[in-house]
């Protein structure tokens, strides 16, 4: 059984939109800490702690108040695309990205609509939070990218099923090969007469 198509993922996103937004909001508010803007190790620890419990989380990074990335991309996953994104992105202008534009106008966690990730080339959504100091001034923004298909699977409890798909394919392939062998033997026997 193959993964869902992009259209299937978008349809599922709209079905589970509120649950996805609440989940990402709770994850992002749980990691918010002033040290994330100054300490790359704290940022890495925060993401790896999140990824341990939420396997759909792809990347975490921070932006300054102007929308310029102030940290490197922090990636704890071992997916094929992760090495090309890990440790990059610092000083990139993200001021026109949807997550920044939404977060700039809000004091709460915002979640983008699905879009193709430039890092993973998969559909993703981003959650963003404007981080304020004690006086209410913006320090910057915390951005969390998640794989949309994996998030939907997590919410629907499909992660275990997906893990067994290769085993099912193998078993089905053996059955099909066995049936072809039976057909071949029968055809051989029929032509020998």
Kindly label every feature range from the protein language model:
Residues 2-45:
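Extracellular/periplasmic ligand-binding regions of membrane signal-transduction receptors
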Residues 120-159:
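Conserved beta-strands of PAS-like sensory domains
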Residues 45-53, 102:
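Amphipathic alpha-helical regulatory segments at dimerization interfaces
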